[in-house]
Design a protein with these regions (language model features):
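Conserved lysine of the Walker
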Residues: 469
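A short helix-turn-beta junction within AAA+ P-loop NTPase domains corresponding to the substrate/partner-engaging
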Residues: 505-509, 719-732
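P-loop NTPase motor domains
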Residues: 71, 78-97, 104, 108, ...
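Hydrophobic positions on the alpha1 helix immediately C-terminal to the Walker A/P-loop
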Residues: 472
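Post-Walker A helix-loop "phosphate-sensing" segment adjacent to the P-loop in P-loop NTPases
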Residues: 479-489
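Conserved P-loop NTPase
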Residues: 747-800
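Hydrophobic anchor at the beta1->P-loop junction of P-loop NTPases
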Residues: 461
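Extended, folded cores of ATP/NTP-driven motor/assembly subunits in large transport
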Residues: 2-423
Length: 800
């Protein structure tokens, strides 16, 4: 076997022939490539995304991302809109030249079939499955007519350069906290995203059909895959000048040419109103203030030099030297104004790139979507232009990674950038046990709420006759009945709820002077109060009851209160010693306990009670003989008459409070709907007790709702402040002009918001939940069984 001699390093290598050189160059080119990515993963321009949300774009560039929610802007008070705009300006001014900011607004379609299934109410094999099916159909119809097939999300990505990941993390964390502070001042909910959330967003962009994202950090090491493999599309094709292929879909990236002399704060919102899949990105790069001022001064110097040349030319030609080309004069004035803004006002200079990414199933649909977006730009005197041979760079720049490879930029000041307000209207779309409350009239999205999760779930429904107030209550009752196991009680002064309660197999308790249904106002249970003794709160109720019975503007005197309290303690002593139904006192026991004190004040109270104990209005002087353990109970008090109606409402409220205290120990909520609620607050004697109960309901798992058409009476109550402060849910339907003015002042409604309660159709108005005010519409189709059992129109009421 012959040996090959290995040449020493000092030996001169053999000279290559021309053919050998060409062969080697070909091999190098083959393996080195032309710099173009050959895989979908290679197009995604980052090196790594870490679990804490830091993205390493290259060796020295790092980014983090904040997800933020919408807030009510377009319908807000003018001063609120101004404040939001100023806070946006502050946010942009915070960003210096070392921080690149990217705002991303993603409208992504979800699987409509899976999305619709999430609104299905499962059948339970009882008599209400047909109603469940009909109610589900109503929800799914509203879903189809609205925009809820599109999930709208908003992101702010900030990018910096650093020498190491450790240094980058420290600075990114600090910047993130500062930016969250700015969002908080705007009343906007925001949070810094972790790595998995950022990957899920990328996956959603690359998989527009809503394919579920499956990923776990523990999968990376065993599989040998990178995070890109979990988010990349099946294919990317950039073979044409103005479109690209994304899996089985087509996409196009366009840039916005800002030609308008003035910009509108509604332009960005109009881009996002489209019902197609769209991704809008704003890349904002601050320019160092000193450098910006120097640049503008140089421009002014150049313009002045051109002006001098034009003046010399004018002198040589023999015409007036003050006559200059109009463009030159305009540019000179604009440059000086810009310099003045930077030097004397809180303005900075930014370079803005505005990109719009459309994705569709077909080229024709893509063309239509791009045309629609271009129409929005045209509306504001701007132009949307497709990128030529830069679609790949456009796609990369549309990913919320903080990278901008499109160098088509427009210089704008702080206020010009902030005019692209990223807010429209706040959505109310809670998950979990949320119930349907209508359609957001501004965004056409469904309103899904869980009142029990609110700080104070108590609510009010206010509207003129015929505005849909009763329908609103009944719609909520149906939702509670079908989707929860909660108890529901109704105080029904007009006997309007009977058809609904009967169809849902509920119980109607008819209270009247001639009825045989009796409810004892002195009923009590051992859980009646938080205190060791339940008598303290019950004594308050009896005092309110007696005040209402005795009438008068001054209420009970101090001695009268004392004798009543003494009598209350006496009549409950046997029951507290042995809590059985036989020992439960009734009004005649209270009457006798007052007489037994042999005091003039006690006798005076006893005489006032005579009418309700042994007189013609003794309907409440009986032990309770109705079973109120049905989960749906309506108290029909229509025939109580004017004299007894207020007493009846007070007694019903107390009965429901007793049920609330029982249900709390079982972990069950209790809903209470009080129609003509103003009657309880109109009289000072009952207002204080009602306000106290209103406050206590929240702690004990109660969800009360007061409904009335007499807004003036309601708002004139001395206790209305307590009621409003403890009510985080208010439905405003059509209002009379006087009531609308009062409500607008009380609830701080803007002029635009007031339009939704002025001559509005039945079932339309404003919904206030915590600090959110939304215009809504909640129509119930007339051809449904639900409508027939809920309507109160005489021509539509049917016998069941």
């Amino acid at each position: 076997m012959s040996r090959k001699t290995i040449p020493r390093e000092t030996e001169k290598p053999k000279k290559l022939t021309r053919a050998q050189k060409k062969e080697i160059d070909a091999v190098i080119r083959k393996y080195k490539g032309d710099g173009k990515p050959r895989t979908a993963q290679a197009t995604i321009p980052y090196e790594a995304i870490y679990p804490d949300g830091v993205c390493r774009i290259d060796r020295r560039t790092f980014s983090k991302c904040i997800a933020f929610e919408d807030i009510s802007y377009q319908l807000a008070q003018p001063e609120t809109r101004t404040a939001i705009f100023e806070h946006l300006c502050d946010l942009y001014n915070y960003v210096d030249a070392s921080i690149h900011v990217q705002l991303s607004f993603l409208n992504r379609k979800v699987d409509p079939v899976q999305y619709a299934k999430s609104f299905e109410i499962a059948p339970q094999g009882d008599d209400f499955d047909d109603i469940r099916a009909e109610y589900t159909a109503i929800l799914q119809k509203q879903l189809a007519s609205g925009n809820n097939g599109i999930v709208k999300t908003k992101y702010l990505t900030f990018t910096i350069e650093a020498d190491s990941p450790k240094t980058a993390r420290a600075r990114l964390t600090r910047i993130g906290l500062d930016l969250l502070g700015y969002f908080k001042t705007m009343g906007c909910v925001a949070h810094v995203m972790d790595g998995q959330a950022r990957l899920e967003v990328l996956h959603g962009i690359f998989h527009p059909d809503g394919e579920p994202f499956r990923f776990d950090w523990d999968w990376l090491a065993p599989s040998g895959l990178s995070t890109k493999d979990f988010v990349a599309p099946s294919s990317l094709c950039f073979g044409t000048a103005k479109t690209f292929g994304l899996g089985g879909k087509y996409g196009a990236v366009s840039f916005l040419q800002i030609l308008a002399p003035e910009l509108s704060d509604e332009m960005l919102a109009d881009f996002l109103k489209t019902e197609s899949g769209i991704l809008v990105n704003l890349h904002v790069q601050a320019i160092d203030q000193t450098e910006a001022i120097k640049t503008i001064k140089r421009k002014i110097t150049d313009l002045d030099a051109m002006k001098i040349q034009e003046q010399k030319k004018a002198v040589r030609s023999g015409y007036d030297m003050d006559i200059l080309p109009s463009d030159l004069a305009t540019y000179g004035e604009d440059a000086k104004k810009l310099l003045n803004k930077l030097q004397t006002r809180n303005e900075r200079l930014f370079m803005l790139t505005f990109l719009v990414l459309n994705v569709a199933d077909t080229k024709q649909k893509l063309g239509n979507d791009v045309f629609q977006a271009a129409g929005v730009a045209q509306k504001y005197n701007c132009s949307l232009v497709r990128l030529d041979y830069q679609q790949e760079q456009g796609l990369v720049s549309s990913l919320p990674l903080g990278i901008n490879q499109i160098k088509i930029q427009r210089s704008l000041t702080t206020s010009n950038v902030a005019v692209f307000v990223p807010f429209v209207t706040q959505e109310l779309f809670q998950s979990g046990a949320a119930m349907y409350y209508g359609i957001n009239a501004k965004s056409h999205n469904m309103i899904m709420l869980d009142r029990k999760q609110a700080r104070c779930p108590n609510g009010l429904k206010l509207g003129t006759p015929g505005s849909g107030k009763s329908m609103s209550c009944k719609s909520e009752i149906v939702s509670v009945f079908l989707t929860t196991a909660d108890d529901i009680f109704i105080s029904d002064p007009e006997a309007e709820y009977y058809p609904l309660v009967k169809r849902l197999h509920g119980q109607v308790i008819k209270l009247s002077p001639t009825s045989k249904d009796y409810v004892n106002p002195l009923d009590i249970n051992l859980n009646y109060s938080e205190d060791d003794s339940p008598l303290a709160l019950k004594s308050d109720f009896v005092l309110s009851f007696c005040e209402l019975v005795m009438g008068g503007k001054t209420g009970l005197e101090a001695i009268e209160r004392t004798v009543i309290d003494r009598a209350v303690k006496a009549i409950y002593r046997p029951y507290l010693a042995n809590p059985c139904p036989e020992n439960m006192p009734i009004l005649s026991d209270l009457h006798q306990a007052l007489l037994d004190q042999h005091l003039p004040e006690a006798d005076r109270v006893a005489q006032a009670l005579d009418l309700y104990v042994s007189g013609s209005l003794n309907v409440f002087n009986h032990k309770t003989n109705v079973d109120i353990h049905n989960r749906l109970v309506a108290f029909d008090i229509k025939e109580l008459g004017k004299q007894l109606k207020k007493l009846g409402m007070l007694i019903i409220q107390d009965q429901i409070w007793g049920r609330v205290t029982q249900n709390r120990s079982q972990g069950r909520a209790t809903w209470y709907f009080a129609d003509e609620f103003h009657l309880l607050l109109k009289e000072e004697q009952t207002a204080a007790y009602s306000a106290e109960i209103w406050k206590r309901f929240r702690k004990w798992g109660g969800v009360p709702t007061g409904a009335t058409q007499n807004v003036k009476d309601l708002l004139s109550s001395p206790e209305i402040e307590n009621i409003l402060e403890n009510s985080d849910f208010i439905t405003l339907l059509n209002q009379a002009s006087g009531d609308r003015k009062i409500l607008s002042e009380r609830l701080n409604l803007s002029a635009d918001q007031q339009k939704y309660i002025d001559n509005s159709e039945p079932g339309e108005g404003l919904l206030i939940f915590e600090n959110v005010v939304l215009p809504f519409s909640n129509p119930i189709p007339k051809n449904t069984q639900l409508y027939k059992i809920m309507t109160t129109r005489l021509s539509e009421v049917v016998e069941l």
